[in-house]
């Protein structure tokens, strides 16, 4: 019923833009021969992690409903600067919308919160710390926006706090998110 895949940093889950053939879905269909594969959820192209695929079309909606109804508890880890002045654990709630001034970026804005992330610091090594992130909502770039807004931009993030390369620039796999 399910196929669980460990997605690398650079690969989008579904075909998009210049990544039509080089997407996780297209690669899996070619490799497995299962044409009915469909992602149950997505993670950002720059993010590595587990992605669930439905094998049978008749099961897809039931699995997607688990994510939609927030019955799946997602956990992420991130490396970001250590700031002793920020007490952990904490909950970040904010309104996230598309940045009108930035290509494919999101920003926190005033208004009713539409995103929530629970954040804790796992350990510290010099100027860096490892954090665990529990998103309760699923806005685009939510974890990256929340960490950046706290003054804790994730190591290797190509968009936050500033765009490090344009949409047509070549990939730099030496410094992943």
Residue map of PLM features:
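RNA pseudouridine synthases
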Residues: 1-177
């Amino acid at each position: 019923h399910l196929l669980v895949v460990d997605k690398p940093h650079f690969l989008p889950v579904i075909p998009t833009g210049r990544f039509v053939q080089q997407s996780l879905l297209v690669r899996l269909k070619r490799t497995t021969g299962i044409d009915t594969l469909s992602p149950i959820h997505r993670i950002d192209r720059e993010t590595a992690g587990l992605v669930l695929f439905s094998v049978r079309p008749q099961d897809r909606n039931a699995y997607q409903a688990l994510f939609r109804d927030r019955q799946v508890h997602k956990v992420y880890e991130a490396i970001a600067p250590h700031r002793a002045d920020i007490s952990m654990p904490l909950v970040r709630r904010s309104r996230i919308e598309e940045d009108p001034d930035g290509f494919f970026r999101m920003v926190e804005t005033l208004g009713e919160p539409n995103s929530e992330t629970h954040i804790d610091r796992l350990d510290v090594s010099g100027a860096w710390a490892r954090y665990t992130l529990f998103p309760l909502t699923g806005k685009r770039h939510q974890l990256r926006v929340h960490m950046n807004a706290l003054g804790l931009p994730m190591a290797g993030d190509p968009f936050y706090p500033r765009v490090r390369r344009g949409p047509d620039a070549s990939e730099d796999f030496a410094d992943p998110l």
